[in-house]
């Protein structure tokens, strides 16, 4: 469990007021949060007491695996026409073939591109299972918090990246930033282009997870990297072809202890492209009492909680 509280000071600088990480013990390996609501709720209560965070309003992130995220192409429409098509439920049924009932999902959409020449438009479609959302909010409530914002994890990451770009004043990166989440649970490329997120899932097999977790077998690691990079390369090429923009660097977010050894392999597989760990607090003021605990070689996995706190 990670808790963070950020505030703006008089100089309009972001300050990390509170930060606390709490390790949960006694759960089986590969256990999910929703399978152990009482245990997680109790642990959250303990974490809150130790963190000394006083506000009860919280922003929480649900895993990308709990959501369906797709960029779909539709005939060109005005916002009014799009609204009518959504109201009748016909649009999503035609564009997104879901096996479940649409009423079981909370749906968010955003038009990310209109192409008048081809008479088409690209829409970001995000559907989160209501049962999962209710499960997470009840755990948060049990822990003593009120979930006022519920975001899919990748959008919390987007918030962290956007803020870092804004603080740095990097106009180029504000217009185009590519992010790669790489780990045991979440794997996707997210390209932020003119503030629109274009997300592509990266598939890894169950045996690949074992390789990431335990393996020191060079052959297995190289095979995993090849398969992984083929998908990353494809996602980048698809974007570059469509938008005629070049991606030179990817900010990497990962919770893997040995992520550095993989980054070296990524660079060899995708020459002329940089892979660097993202630091979500590089431009944030960190008080002395917190700085020691945050001197980490890899701070990228703090991106979600920091992005939520902004």
Spans of model-derived segments:
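Small-residue (GG/TT-enriched) beta-loop-alpha framework at ligand/catalytic clefts
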Residues: 1-19, 54, 60, 114-232
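Early-domain small/polar-rich strand-loop-helix modules and first-structured segments
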Residues: 1-68, 150, 278
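N-terminal phosphate-binding loop and adjacent alpha-helix
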Residues: 18-49, 209-227, 232-236, 293
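Phosphate/pyrophosphate-binding loops at sites that engage ATP/ADP/AMP, CoA/4′-phosphopantetheine
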Residues: 44-57, 233-249
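Active-site neighborhood for divalent-cation/phosphate handling
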Residues: 57, 61-165, 279-286, 301
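A polyampholytic, Gly/Pro-enriched intrinsically disordered region
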Residues: 102, 168-176, 221-224, 292-307
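A short, acidic, amphipathic alpha-helical segment used as a generic capping/interface helix at domain edges
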Residues: 228-241, 257-261
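Conserved phosphate-binding/catalytic loops in two-lobed NTP-binding clefts
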Residues: 264-303
């Amino acid at each position: 469990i990670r808790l963070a509280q950020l505030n703006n000071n008089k100089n309009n600088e972001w300050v990390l007021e509170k930060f606390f990480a709490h390790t949960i013990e006694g759960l089986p390996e590969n256990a999910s949060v929703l399978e152990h609501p009482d245990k997680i709720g109790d642990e959250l209560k303990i974490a809150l007491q130790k963190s000394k965070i006083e506000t009860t309003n919280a922003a929480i992130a649900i895993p990308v695996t709990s959501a369906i995220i797709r960029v779909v192409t539709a005939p060109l429409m005005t916002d009014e026409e799009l609204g009518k098509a959504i109201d009748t439920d016909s649009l999503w049924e035609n564009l997104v073939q879901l096996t479940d009932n649409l009423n079981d999902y909370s749906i968010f959409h955003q038009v990310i591109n209109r192409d008048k020449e081809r008479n088409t438009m690209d829409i970001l479609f995000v559907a989160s299972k209501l049962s999962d959302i209710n499960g997470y909010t009840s755990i948060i409530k049990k822990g003593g918090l009120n979930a006022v914002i519920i975001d899919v994890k990748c959008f919390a990451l987007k918030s962290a990246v956007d803020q870092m770009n804004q603080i740095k004043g990097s106009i180029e990166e504000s217009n185009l930033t590519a992010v790669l989440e790489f780990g045991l649970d979440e794997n996707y490329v997210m390209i932020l282009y003119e503030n629109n997120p274009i997300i592509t899932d990266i598939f890894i097999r169950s045996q690949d997870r074992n390789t990431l977790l335990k393996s020191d077998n060079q052959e297995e690691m190289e095979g995993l990297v090849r398969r992984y990079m083929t998908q990353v390369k494809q996602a980048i090429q698809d974007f570059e072809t469509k938008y005629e923009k070049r991606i030179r660097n990817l900010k990497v977010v990962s919770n893997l202890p040995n992520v550095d050894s993989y980054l070296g392999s990524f660079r060899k597989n995708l020459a002329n492209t940089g892979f660097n760990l993202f630091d979500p607090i590089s431009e944030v003021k960190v008080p002395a009492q917190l700085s020691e605990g945050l001197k980490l070689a890899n701070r990228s996995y703090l991106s979600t909680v920091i992005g939520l706190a902004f």
